[in-house]
């Protein structure tokens, strides 16, 4: 009894030291309580992803006994390779390795995909919490983790919400380059995402954010306060932690205000950097919301055959061109799982060709 109490007391003495180490901001890399969850989850996801990308056997993704190979050892390269999503025969069932009769069955049904995405989603969520935790420890404001929530929401949209809405993890995004593009093509074919306003906002956020980042960086670099000679690197003119400003915001404001017009230029550094952060973040949030709505088939705008002349004859538009492309992609994907896409199998015929030549 005495021995057991001594062991417990020694463990209790070590616990406060462990807590202090986990929450210490003096470590070279901050761990944090969220890090205790993040590190094993991301390591598990990375390890399974690497092994599956190299050596996983083909997966029966459509549930029709026609396996699709995605690994290096089965003939793929870095472009065509992927961790193939779990089988449509599994649907939305949670499919850990102990639910399969054998490891071979688990691999055949795409079990590694679920292992990777679940650990990955938990890991990046914990990483976001770790950002908040470190900001809290250092007395900083919490907006870093808020900005990071944009890519986190995108990951949850394509890996979790979309499969939930479609009824199967086989509809999730494959973990590979060509698999990602295949996912994008199929998404366009089935949901017309290019005509969804939230996707348009996301495109504006990505391209606009890149433009604003380049504009800001070039303006700052062009208005640095000279601290060095011509023979020295201008980077030597800045000392880490210096109090004085390293560039002339008045000069940058004056330049940009004259290049476009006065009120297009920020005269407040804080509001400028807030805008640089909030614009792409909000746009990516909107894109994630768009994916989540289209997951439940609330799709993009449909302008098929929407313009007619005085005689009621259809005047083809770019909406009809886009519809024709969508039908082509929809016919090609899962070609052995379905006879026709839903659009072609409908009672009313859909005009595919914009025009046909006269024969005879």
Curated annotation (Swiss-Prot):
Reaction equations catalysed: 2 a plastoquinone + 4 hnu + 2 H2O = 2 a plastoquinol + O2
Modification after translation, per record: Tyr-162 forms a radical intermediate that is referred to as redox-active TyrZ, YZ or Y-Z.
Record: residues binding Fe cation: 216, 273
GO cellular component: photosystem II; plasma membrane-derived thylakoid membrane
Molecular function via GO: chlorophyll binding; electron transporter, transferring electrons within the cyclic electron transport pathway of photosynthesis activity; iron ion binding; oxidoreductase activity, acting on diphenols and related substances as donors, oxygen as acceptor; oxygen evolving activity
Positions marked as site (Tyrosine radical intermediate): 162
GO terms of biological process kind: photosynthetic electron transport in photosystem II; response to herbicide
UniProt-annotated binding residues for pheophytin a: 127
EC number: 1.10.3.9
Swiss-Prot/TrEMBL site (Stabilizes free radical intermediate) positions: 191
Membrane topology classification: Multi-pass membrane protein
Co-factor binding details: The D1/D2 heterodimer binds P680, chlorophylls that are the primary electron donor of PSII, and subsequent electron acceptors. It shares a non-heme iron and each subunit binds pheophytin, quinone, additional chlorophylls, carotenoids and lipids. D1 provides most of the ligands for the Mn4-Ca-O5 cluster of the oxygen-evolving complex (OEC). There is also a Cl(-1) ion associated with D1 and D2, which is required for oxygen evolution. The PSII complex binds additional chlorophylls, carotenoids and specific lipids.
Residue stretches spanning the membrane: 30-47, 119-134, 143-157, 198-219, 275-289
Known function: Photosystem II (PSII) is a light-driven water:plastoquinone oxidoreductase that uses light energy to abstract electrons from H(2)O, generating O(2) and a proton gradient subsequently used for ATP formation. It consists of a core antenna complex that captures photons, and an electron transfer chain that converts photonic excitation into a charge separation. The D1/D2 (PsbA/PsbD) reaction center heterodimer binds P680, the primary electron donor of PSII as well as several subsequent electron acceptors.
Subunit structure: PSII is composed of 1 copy each of membrane proteins PsbA, PsbB, PsbC, PsbD, PsbE, PsbF, PsbH, PsbI, PsbJ, PsbK, PsbL, PsbM, PsbT, PsbX, PsbY, Psb30/Ycf12, peripheral proteins PsbO, CyanoQ (PsbQ), PsbU, PsbV and a large number of cofactors. It forms dimeric complexes.
Family stated for the protein in its record: Belongs to the reaction center PufL/M/PsbA/D family.
Note: Cyanobacteria usually contain more than 2 copies of the psbA gene.
Protein known as: Photosystem II protein D1
């Amino acid at each position: 009894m005495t021995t057991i109490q001594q062991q417990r007391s020694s463990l209790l003495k070590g616990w406060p030291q462990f807590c202090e180490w986990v929450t210490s901001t003096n470590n070279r890399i901050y761990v944090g309580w969220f890090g205790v969850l993040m590190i094993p989850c991301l390591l598990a996801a990375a390890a399974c992803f690497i092994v599956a990308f190299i050596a996983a056997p083909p997966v029966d993704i459509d549930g029709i006994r026609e396996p699709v190979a995605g690994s290096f050892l089965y003939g793929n390269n870095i472009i065509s390779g992927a961790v193939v999503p779990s089988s449509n025969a599994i649907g939305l069932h949670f499919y850990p390795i102990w639910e399969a009769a054998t490891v071979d069955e688990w691999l055949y049904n795409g079990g590694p995909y679920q292992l990777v995405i679940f650990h990955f989603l938990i890991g990046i969520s914990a990483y976001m919490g770790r950002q908040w935790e470190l900001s809290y420890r250092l007395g900083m404001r919490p907006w870093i983790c808020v900005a990071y929530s944009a890519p986190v929401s995108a990951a949850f949209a394509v890996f979790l919400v979309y499969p939930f809405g479609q009824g199967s993890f086989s509809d999730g995004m494959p973990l590979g380059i060509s698999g990602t593009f295949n996912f994008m093509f199929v998404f366009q074919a089935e949901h017309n995402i290019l005509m969804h306003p939230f996707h348009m906002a996301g495109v504006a956020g990505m391209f606009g954010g890149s433009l604003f980042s380049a504009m800001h960086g070039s303006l700052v670099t062009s208005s640095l306060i000279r601290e060095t000679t011509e023979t020295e690197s201008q980077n030597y003119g800045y000392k880490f932690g210096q109090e004085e400003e390293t560039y002339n915001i008045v000069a940058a404001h004056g330049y940009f205000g004259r290049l476009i017009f006065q009120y297009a230029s920020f005269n407040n550094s804080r509001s400028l950097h807030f805008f640089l952060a909030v614009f792409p973040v909000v746009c990516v949030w909107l894109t994630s919301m768009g994916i989540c709505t289209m997951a439940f088939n609330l799709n993009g705008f449909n302008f098929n055959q929407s313009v007619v002349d005085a005689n009621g004859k259809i005047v083809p538009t770019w909406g009809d061109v886009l519809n024709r492309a969508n039908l082509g992609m929809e016919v090609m994907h899962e070609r052995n799982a379905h006879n026709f896409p839903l659009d072609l199998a409908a009672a009313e015929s859909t005009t595919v060709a914009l025009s046909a030549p006269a024969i005879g």
